[in-house]
């Protein structure tokens, strides 16, 4: 019964303490308070025996905690001990007159009385010094239990003392705390409360409480040499003291919140801890002698302090502990807890009537956050103006703009500051994008940092949602939360689109003629990061484009090192950087004055002994003049005239010689010089013939050295091309520009710089070069009409991802064939320079409301459907499909007016047959919810159906071409010598189907 009553009193005291703290806007849990008092009972075993709780007794508890921290180290003390201590101290100190606090002290007094140990009534026993030493626990610090009597003036032990003789005093002798088991003298009663002493005795005969405490501790130290030293001597190694065991005190499970150091007292001072408030009985001697004794004790304490072996260590009286990491002192302006702040901010409670039993059943809870005092500074408008200017000039994601934002974010901006900065610096569209990205990243952070149970306000703090939309509340966020806000703001800012960034193809990014290679690679990598994401700027595809899209000068510098396995593009940048210096020197040398051109430029040097022999045998070279003209008015044109051309060769661009004398195989950029057109040795078109009248053979003229002239030369026509040999059937067509062919931009139309028309009574057939298919290039064949006058184009496609076609590459040939006129009927008088290709006449049939239907048999079963010339395959409705015919699901897509994913298809090939006996095989698709069956081109092509238009104009054209109604275009009615391979039946009327009304 007594234990149950004790537990009920404990619960009542803890409940009152929680209510007192809740009034101060502090939330604590019951199990934390129980753990805290359990540690207090372990550290201060005299506290339950004190029988009272007030500010004075609680101050002595703080002294004991400070001594325990100094001796055993911070690792032996729970992290929240000093915080809870400070909270309870403030409750006892600041509101001692409150009825609630008085009731709380009363409940605590009852608990301490119930846990206190009654004083022993055993007769006093004399213990010698040796017995004291043998009975003292070797590994336990002396107890400071306040329930013992202290003998001040005992000299029975015969010990020598530095103090004056106290035999004249009538006070009882002071005893060591180790003698607390002996019965105290009856003339010195034990007083559990100092208030009893003040009410029972005369005020003139009592000591000051401070002097009384000093006297008691000095006397106990004097009579007990093993009393803990009050000076800051080197402390013993820390050890874990044994738990307090008492049969009278039941074990209590306890724990508690976070506190700060008390403001009273100087840390590390040598003052002794306050002993329990044990009041002495009315002294029998004069008070002056007691005061002189007190002065002597203080003098002795001072001397003992001077004898310390080591200087006093600067140990804090009460260490400040918190859950957040320590903030360095050099981080000015960041979040740091105030040293005197020991309150916890009020958190929004979901249920104000939360019971204590719910607190006890919680397995884990969100740790209470301390209040953080920031040296918060609002955003400076000048800084925002700088960021706004950088965004307007360079874009929001430019390196300089991002550097400004990162520098500003080091101040740990709140969500309100980020929103204000986004509205002020970004445009309307970018502001909306930033907000959406910030909210998305905030949700991700909240999910990653979520604990169990999840915090009620975790997802609301990072985006600054209600009730944390106020900037003052946001400034109190802990450093860890502000770090997440900083990271979310920067990530959202860096995800904004670049200024003027258009969605362009990566293959279209080329290096300009005057652009540095590093700038070109930078643009290429930025586009690759924007299209493919970060980490793709060093991929093999980007490296390939860095070579293929570079200008010829950089390509010639990179080409020797292209085959090497390069992990990065840094070596390419080095090669092109050195090559750019050489190009700059060459460009500077091209702008030499005419006088500087007169300087000797020997092509080679030969040392000879006989100049006469050298003049006769040496090849004739253009020699520069040996000396400059002496006449100042002499014309320089005559001097330069004998020096050859004043500009570099247009063919190789390397030397000052004529293009006709150029024998270089590579140009200045290292590119091979490709001879355009056919070979130079080929004769003119047609065979040689002999003029019998004149008696000699006529030879064709020699073709020019460069059959593909530059673009600045006059137009070239088909008749200007040359054949390779007399038996060559085709004329080569070359590209006039450098081209990159990809699967994305193919088919691609390229001009060849050759114009029509063709020779009379001929037409051209465009065919591909035989070696192109092996390179992944496909040239689509075409027909070149006789009267086509525009520029000839060729149509290319590729089967590879990327193919480069240099300028001047031979891609196709024109085969000139004779044109045979059938009749004089034509649609237009001439072709002109319209688009390349054949100008066929299209027969158009007007579609009416009637649907052309056809009945066919599939495996003997009759089906009716609509002729659909736009459908690639036949589709049967699922309602018409027999249930016993097997189906299979195929991984394909059917697209038309609608779309079907993974449709069903016949598992076997079906045989179709029409009413005229024509048959074939198909594998139709089967779709649900299809109202009619569709006959696709897979059946129509096998039936060899043609569409006949009743248009009068079309019919006139067909009749002029030899068409006989009711008959096919036979060999006798068309005028051609070759027969038609397929002759339709002459008795076949129409298309073999009839048109039904819908």
Curated annotation (Swiss-Prot):
PROSITE patterns: ASP_PROT_RETROV (PS50175), ASP_PROTEASE (PS00141), G_PATCH (PS50174). Residues 346-366 have a biased composition (Acidic residues). GO terms for biological process: nucleotide metabolic process; proteolysis; viral translational frameshifting. It is an enzyme of class 3 (hydrolase). It catalyses: dUTP + H2O = dUMP + diphosphate + H(+). InterPro entries: Aspartic_peptidase_AS, B_retro_matrix, B_retro_matrix_sf, dUTPase-like, dUTPase-like_sf, dUTPase_trimeric, G_patch_dom, Gag_p24_C. The active site is at residue 868. A lipid is attached at residue 2 (N-myristoyl glycine). Matrix protein p10: Matrix protein. This is Gag-Pro polyprotein. It comes from Squirrel monkey retrovirus. The lineage of its organism: Viruses, Riboviria, Pararnavirae, Artverviricota, Revtraviricetes.
